[in-house]
């Protein structure tokens, strides 16, 4: 499997610096969430788009995903999604990440929201297919449980729409990797990895930690993915932008890469 890193790890660095460092450590690709420390604006001018593409080419790193802030249950997600699909196509990226958003607790309202989100995705499929860019719904927010993402994907029968399996959020919801793999079988377009431990003193109850030092079963996640024939990217999502107290990328990203390579080598050898 090829290993990438998210630019969330670089909240202040120029994109060229982040790319150069990632390449020097041995990463194979980059997941774009921040550009020069800012969230991606899909309406960026052509010159800025070209500069991003040139920076990635110069570093020798493909842009394997473009991460949006789109929430499918939010306001007017379809227009923003089309802009992100076009942006990803410009960068020859195969994937746009989206969030599901919020869901009501009452069943009728919840079902209506799921239906509306499914219609947004279905309406975007022709553009996705034309541009050669898939849409991945992340296990996040009200869709943190893979069962909820699977419920949405069951309403959109298209190979151009799938899931982004974030290692942390389904674990928070009490799901184990084997269960997640069953729920998302055949539709995982990207696997994002991070580790965390319980931290009752924090508002969200969790603290991100170096890979292997928390309780998120990332190695088992990888085993399940390999057993299921997964051949897409593994991306390290070190969220320095959202959690400034965690280690700098110069420490965290090489550590993640070394451990992931070791785990994957062992799992692949054991599968032979």
Regions found by a protein language model. Give the residues of each.
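Conserved beta-strand positions in the central sheet of alpha/beta enzyme cores
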Residues: 31, 65-67, 97, 136, ...
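Active-site acidic/histidine proton-transfer and metal-coordination neighborhood
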Residues: 16-17, 21, 54-62, 72-163, ...
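Charged helix-capping and loop-helix junction motifs
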Residues: 44-50, 78-83, 110-121, 176-180, ...
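Short glycine-enriched, charge-decorated loop/helix-capping segments at active-site entrances
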Residues: 39-42, 111-112, 205-210
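Active-site-proximal loop/turn and secondary-structure-junction residues that shape catalytic pockets
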Residues: 9-11, 34-36, 69-72, 100-104, ...
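Glycine-rich, proline-tolerant flexible connector loops at the mouths of alpha/beta enzymes
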Residues: 31-53, 103-106
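N-terminal small/glycine-rich loop or linker at the start of catalytic domains
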Residues: 1-4, 62-70, 101-103, 200
